[in-house]
Amino acid sequence: MDAEPKRKFGVVVVGVGRAGSVRLRDLKDPRSAAFLNLIGFVSRRELGSLDEVRQISLEDALRSQEIDVAYICSESSSHEDYIRQFLQAGKHVLVEYPMTLSFAAAQELWELAAQKGRVLHEEHVELLMEEFEFLRREVLGKELLKGSLRFTASPLEEERFGFPAFSGISRLTWLVSLFGELSLISATLEERKEDQYMKMTVQLETQNKGLLSWIEEKGPGLKRNRYVNFQFTSGSLEEVPSVGVNKNIFLKDQDIFVQKLLDQVSAEDLAAEKKRIMHCLGLASDIQKLCHQKK
């Protein structure tokens, strides 16, 4: 990313919640200015402007010749529709995970991006975290016997953020990135809607027959936390040390996206990333089906 492009890519941010606000901030960073030009944001709320960034309508964003790129930072349930509209309009798309709440829809959108000759990038900042880098180093070259990854947090609205296997897909992405493609053995969902409590328990198997449990547990009073326990043929790992603040992970993700815009990522790397994303979305879809069958 050394040479500046002849023309900067005009960007619109769709959705200005937590992720969208971070994207707006990062687009003003000097590192972004060489390649990206923030044109405005789209929001269902009437905000007028935010920190001197103007609000524009969805229709204007889709039509604008100034806008080359859309950052989709809205709630997960709306991702598919926004991605489709912006790709159809000939724009490149960066979307916060999960890109869709169904495997089939994701396949359609990849095909549309290829047909339009546009970049479709699903954000995965969890792979840029210091905790993941620690785990990756610890796991490298070791054979897993069994392990577990449990995540706890406060309740999340399924209607807006999807079934737990989709809203929690960053944890599944960790497991797949650490241990390779996984097979689904079983999945159960315990729900107490009156208490806003849910617990999803998934059993997975590595290609070397190592067993993995993935648990997503959400309810009032549950603090946001990850618990890991991996047993290897050569020792075990029972916690991830506190590594402090993960700095600039959204900016680093944006750097990867810009490399794709500039055609600086190899076809092999793009194919491997897409394969991992689709494997995780496929597992999430299968987990959802299995849990619904048992209801």
UniProtKB/Swiss-Prot annotation:
Residues 1-2 form a propeptide. Signal peptide: none annotated. The modification N6-acetyllysine is found at K247, K252. Changing C280A: Reduced activity. The keyword Membrane does not apply. Its cofactor is Zn(2+). One of its GO terms (biological process) is heme catabolic process. The modification Phosphothreonine is found at T173. Disulfide bonds: none annotated. It comes from the Eukaryota. NAD(+) binds at R18, A19, S76, S77, S78, H79, Y97, S167. Zn(2+) binds at H279, C280, C291, H292. Monomer. Belongs to the Gfo/Idh/MocA family. Biliverdin reductase subfamily. Reduces the gamma-methene bridge of the open tetrapyrrole, biliverdin IXalpha, to bilirubin with the concomitant oxidation of a NADH or NADPH cofactor. Does not reduce bilirubin IXbeta. Uses the reactants NADH or NADPH depending on the pH; NADH is used at the acidic pH range (6-6.9) and NADPH at the alkaline range (8.5-8.7). NADPH, however, is the probable reactant in biological systems. This is Biliverdin reductase A.
